[in-house]
Swiss-Prot record:
CDD domains (alphabetical): RRF (cd00520)
Protein name: Ribosome-recycling factor
GO MF assignments: ribosomal large subunit binding
Subcellular location field: Cytoplasm
Keywords on record: Cytoplasm, Protein biosynthesis
A Pfam cross-reference name: RRF
Source organism, top-level taxon: Bacteria
GO annotation terms (biological process): translational termination
Cysteine pairings via disulfide bonds: none
Cellular compartments per GO CC: cytoplasm
Lineage of producing organism: Bacteria, Bacillati, Actinomycetota, Actinomycetes, Micrococcales
Function: Responsible for the release of ribosomes from messenger RNA at the termination of protein biosynthesis. May increase the efficiency of translation by recycling ribosomes from one round of translation to another.
Length: 185
């Protein structure tokens, strides 16, 4: 039971780190990055469809993204979804591909994005700590109910603390990299 509890906690912590990575990727840095559009949904034949399923991405230079739809009839729908997205893109359509030029970020905008990244990072850390708290409660219950010994419970708690620290450190590392990326001119 202890191993299952630890394994479940680790899986949930890994998921929290993955969500943080996706959140960080969706924040633009003034550099072309297809990850900006991971959450864009296109109304394709009446059904919201992720952009990655409808088109391929190419990055010809540091500030341009070319989006080539697999189905040319979806070009207008994709362009509309990009215009409506929170990314702040101005797509131009030449009939075959959609070209997006990423504008340079102002100093104020960069600082704003750093604050957003820090908030998302802190949310991820809180999520990891909540997972730790729930796992610790489950471990304490196992010891209390006599399903595990005191020594096993203490060892498992130390292992849980190690997992928590490793995942929080992982978030901190992601945070540092994204901050450096944002502040780089």
């Amino acid at each position: 039971m202890i191993e299952e509890t630890l394994l479940e906690a680790e899986e949930k912590m890994d998921k929290a780190v993955e969500v943080a990575k996706e959140d960080f990727a969706s924040i633009r840095t003034g550099r072309a990055n297809p990850g900006l559009y991971n959450r864009v949904l296109v109304d394709y034949y009446g059904s919201p469809t992720p952009l990655q399923q409808l088109a391929s991405f190419a990055i010809p230079d540091a500030r341009t993204i070319l989006i080539t739809p697999f189905d040319k009839t979806a070009l207008r729908d994709i362009e509309r979804a990009l215009s409506d997205s929170e990314v702040g893109a101005n797509p131009s359509n030449d009939g075959n591909v959609i070209r997006i030029t990423i504008p340079e970020l102002t100093k104020e905008r960069r600082k704003e994005y750093v604050k957003i990244v820090k908030t998302k990072g802190e949310d991820a850390k809180v999520s990891i700590r909540n997972i730790r708290r729930k796992a610790k409660e489950a471990l304490d219950r196992l010891v209390k109910d006599g399903e595990a010994g005191e020594d096993e419970g203490t060892r498992a708690e130390k292992e849980l603390d190690g997992l928590t620290k490793a995942h929080v450190d992982g978030i901190d590392e992601l945070l540092k990299r994204k901050e450096a990326e944002l502040l780089e001119v």
